[in-house]
Regions:
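C-terminal structured "cap/appendage" subdomains that terminate the fold
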Residues: 230, 253, 257-260
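Basic, polar low-complexity surface loops/patches
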Residues: 16, 36-37, 47-51, 89-100, ...
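Non-catalytic, usually N-terminal nucleic-acid engagement modules in DNA/RNA processing proteins
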Residues: 1-57, 61-71, 79
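Short, basic, glycine/proline-bearing loop/turn elements
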Residues: 22-33, 97-107, 299, 305-312
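Long, highly charged low-complexity segments
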Residues: 257-312
Length: 312
């Protein structure tokens, strides 16, 4: 039996923030900040070279407001605006994706996570082994069978065992645990007084969120019982917020996501424009001048740079 083809889905939106905070400030000749673009581009180059996937796509958020905001207006309302130096880099990471000849996915009204869920299902239906490249715990609900994750910051593979270690339940029950525990980062309310550990214990006992809420009167701890009854609808709303949609729009079909050969002329032009000397050396191109970056920090992001590259 032949080995399954591999689909790699890269959480582009998640990675740009991590690259921005992991690398020191960098600017190109016109003063535009590019540290996140550098880390993002270096990671993608290494990732594709290492994995050699049959199919690939880089997935982005379009805007903060999605269908979840209609369900619960306070969803993610506590998040601050992105740093000023990061704003111009959002367009540049998309340009980097295209310069690397990689398919790009985004859909208004949906989060990148929903597109990843949708395409993971499509890959599964097509008989592909899907690898989700992300550090986002919210994507762990998708792990099953031939769908696994890679945390690019820690270079750590995540399967069902790792998900259960983090949440205390199997991947198919992660959504119910998150619905109970809530998430302060995304302003998902959950049920007061219930964290991940308690939520996992309850779901493991009662099987799922609906069964737990139906039998909340059986809970012995008075305050916990009271909260589960009083905030039952809040838990159901939270489940709608954390559950990833597998019916998001599909900008491309799977066949259009076959890993293409790089257009080296396009890539070189992009790297020259950004002053990414080290990456130009990596692809064997001549360089004139560039910007500087910390090789040690870049390596800590899981990106190994040539020892002879000098400064960017």
């Amino acid at each position: 039996m032949s080995e399954k083809g591999r689909l790699v889905l890269v959480d582009g939106s998640g990675y740009i923030f991590r690259a921005f905070h992991a690398l020191p400030p960098m600017t190109r000749r016109d003063g535009t900040p590019v540290n996140a673009v550098y880390g993002f581009t270096a990671m993608l180059m290494k990732l594709i070279d290492d994995l050699q996937p049959d199919h690939v796509a880089v997935v982005f958020d379009v805007a903060r407001k999605t269908f979840r905001s209609d369900i619960y207006p306070e969803y993610k309302a506590n998040r601050s605006e992105p740093p000023e130096d990061l704003v111009p880099q959002f367009a540049l990471v998309r340009a980097a994706t295209k310069a690397l000849s990689l398919p790009l996915l985004e859909a208004p009204g949906f989060e990148a996570d929903d597109l990843i869920a949708t395409y993971a299902r499509l890959g599964e239906d097509a008989g592909l082994a899907t690898l989700i490249v992300s550090s986002d715990k919210d994507l762990m609900q998708l792990v099953r069978g031939d769908i696994t994750m890679l945390d690019p910051m820690k270079q750590r593979r995540i399967g069902a065992i790792e998900v259960e270690e983090k949440f205390g339940v199997t991947p198919d029950k992660v959504v119910d645990v998150q619905a109970l525990a809530g998430d302060s980062t995304d302003n998902v309310p959950g049920v007061p007084g219930i964290g991940i550990k308690t939520a996992a214990e309850l779901i493991n006992i009662y099987g799922d969120l609906d069964s737990l809420l139906e039998r909340a009167g059986e809970i012995k701890q008075p305050k916990r019982r009271e909260n589960l009854i009083e905030f039952a609808e809040q838990a159901r709303i939270s489940r709608q917020l954390v559950l990833l949609r597998e019916d998001a729009p599909k900008p491309l079909d799977i066949d259009a996501m076959k890993t293409p050969a790089r257009d080296m002329d396009v890539l070189k032009a992009f790297l020259v424009e950004q002053n990414f000397k080290r990456l130009l050396i990596r692809i064997g191109a001549s360089v004139d001048a560039g910007t500087s970056a910390s090789a040690a920090v870049v390596r800590s992001m899981g990106v190994t740079l040539p020892a002879t590259a000098g400064q960017d």
